[in-house]
Curated annotation (Swiss-Prot):
Main location: nucleus
Biological source species: Saccharomyces cerevisiae (strain ATCC 204508 / S288c)
Pfam families: Spt4
Zinc finger region(s), C4-type: 7-27
Additional facts recorded: Present with 4490 molecules/cell in log phase SD medium.
Protein name: Transcription elongation factor SPT4
Length: 102
């Protein structure tokens, strides 16, 4: 069983322990503002991994909408739905589960 989880908002992949200890390095402020726990906003079910060394210079990072995020491993697709409290704070939110077609 894998202990990795992916953030449903930014897609960063970390261990369960890292999320529990530090929260999401990109999204923790939003989760705190919404009053939800990091674990409610992460999923153990995700597909594909992309390593980002320099997100600000990567076309893949721009495609995944993480070009303003920290370097790390990112999931291409994350299964699950963010709590409504988080979605309400994000007028331009696009789910990472593939449910929204552009």
């Amino acid at each position: 069983m894998s202990s990795e989880r992916a953030c449903m908002l930014c897609g960063i992949v970390q261990t369960t322990n890292e999320f529990n200890r530090d929260g999401c390095p990109n999204c923790q402020g939003i989760f705190e503002e919404a009053g939800v726990s990091t674990m409610e906003c992460t999923s153990p079910s995700f597909e594909g991994l992309v390593g980002m060394c320099k997100p600000t210079k990567s076309w893949v990072a721009k495609w995944l909408s993480v070009d303003h995020s920290i370097a790390g491993m990112y999931a291409i697709k994350v299964d699950g739905r963010l709590p409504a409290e988080v979605v309400e704070l994000l007028p331009h939110y696009k789910p990472r589960d593939g449910s929204q077609v552009e």
